[in-house]
Structure formats: C-alpha cells, structure tokens
Amino acid sequence: MHTIQMSIYVLGLLVALALIFDFMNGFHDAANAIATVVSTGVLKPQTAVAMSAVFNFVAIFTVGVHVATTVGKGTVDPSVVDHYVVFGALVGAIIWNVVTWYYGIPSSSSHALIGGLVGAAVAKSGTGALVGSGLLKTVIFIVVSPLMGFVLGSVVMLIVSWVFVRSTPRKVDTWFRRLQLFSAAAYSLGHGGNDAQKTIGIIWMLLIVAGVTAPTATEPPLWVIISCYTAISLGTLFGGWRIVKTMGQKITKLKPVGGFCAESGGAITLFVATAAGIPVSTTHTITGAIVGVGSAQKASAVRWGVAGNIVWAWIFTIPASAFMAAIAWWIGKHIL
C-alpha cells in the first residue's frame, strides 16, 4: 500500500473523527442491545445501558480482529485510500447516523460506514476503486443477517414454547426475566465484537496510508483496539433513546420470553459473523430476530408496516451515506 504525506494534525483530526463515529455507533445502536430488555420491563433503562456498555467493552477480550481486516483492506482498493477518502467516509456515515437517529429510524451504522467508504472512493477514482469480492460479501449479508436472526429467533421461540407448554404464564415470566439478563449481555458482547472492529479497520487503514503502521502488519496497534472499544462503550452508555421504542414495542409486543429468544437468535448470528470476519449490521440482525419471535407466535403479532419502513431505511443506507460521503470528499479536498 502506498504512503502519503499527512501532517500530524490532519492524522489526529481523522483519528478523532473516527472515534466520534465509533461513539455515535454505540449511541445510535445502543437501542439494538437494550430495547428488548427495557421494553419487557426486566431492567430499567439506566441499568440496561450500563450493563450493555460493560459487555461492549468486554468484547475486546473475546474476539479477534477479522472484521477489522475486512473493513480495512477488503472493501475498497487500499491504493486509492487517502485522508480525503477517510474524511469523506466518516462524515457521510456520521451525517446519516444523525439523520436516522433524529427520526428514530433503526438503520445500520455499519452499512453507513461501508457506504461512506464506497462513496468517497468512487468519487476519487471511479468504480474501479471497489473490491468486488469484499463488497459482495457485505451486500449478501445485508440480506442474510436479518434472515439468520429471523430464523434463529423464531426457532428458539418455538422450542421454548414447546418446552414450557405445561408451565403457567407466571412461572414462564419469572424464569425468563432472569434468563433475559444473560441473553441481553450476550447480544451486547456480540454488538461490541462486530461493531467496534469497523472503526478499528478504518483507523488501521489510515495509519497504514500515513506510514505509521507497516502494511504487512497482521493486527492493528493495541491503542487503536482499546480506543475503539472505549468509544463504542461510552456511546452505548449515553444511549440513543429515540430508537428504543421502535425496536422494543412498535414492531411487536415483547414479553420476557420473547425478548430472550430475540436476543439469543441475534447474538448467535453476530458471533458467527464475527468469527467469519463479516461486518454485519447489528440493527438488521436484532430486527430480524424480533420479527421472527413475533411471527412464531402469530403473523398478526408483527406490525408489518413498521417492519417495512425499517427495510426501506436499510435499502437507502448505503446509497445515501455514499452520496453524502462523495460530497464530503469533495469538501475535504478543499479544506484539509
């Protein structure tokens, strides 16, 4: 990978911007990890946020950096990446996150970042800047991750319903109010493990381009890993409350047993994707799982209109953030 001349101030600005995105990722996507456990009344919002923040950070000790490698080297051609491309990608993703947070739309921070990278790279060098195989893997999992969440959420719900068929509703509720603490923790662990790595990949790519880190390095610097996990944990701690209601109650009404099944299905999907180095959307995953839980009870339990609006937000995320990133790239060329 080529290196470019970059002042320490510009490098510092871009690293700070990446950490701001990571903070906003935690802030924006906090609802994914806590919405079910809050909406079922198992935990109070403040307690749920604190628990989620802790497990987002703990993920640093439990997963590798496979996702960071995909984002840093497998989405766009590293030879076209410079500080302008990174600036455009981050600004485009941040703007889309702010817009969707303001309107309470549970869109994907992950795909906003991928879209930002694509838009800025194409603005600089055309479509030849894209790594087709890596981008295809990401696009495929836009569909696969919510489907996996849907299937696993519904299967777990059906199994649980069969196992506890003779139990009283009160007994089931008591059991799953406890079990949901574990499933919520597992989902937060999966969220931190997959999502923080996307920003690690961006900063790693930036450091290689600036000549600070060797392009042959197999892992990013330790300070990058710690900084990114800290930023996403702090973002989670402050939480994006506008989205909690949509995720927790508007799609389908959840009880503790449903919350447990949705979080379990979502967590399994995230762990599998992270192990495979695939940057999936935690938003897509938990939404699919929630819909799966609702439909396992009965199709009418799902508010399909709300689910449809969320799908439209997913479809527009990559092109919208790519468009904003292309504009930000052009602006960055004139101010950095």
Question: Which ranges hold each PLM region?
Answer:
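Multi-pass alpha-helical transmembrane bundle typical of ion/small-solute transporters
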Residues: M1-L336
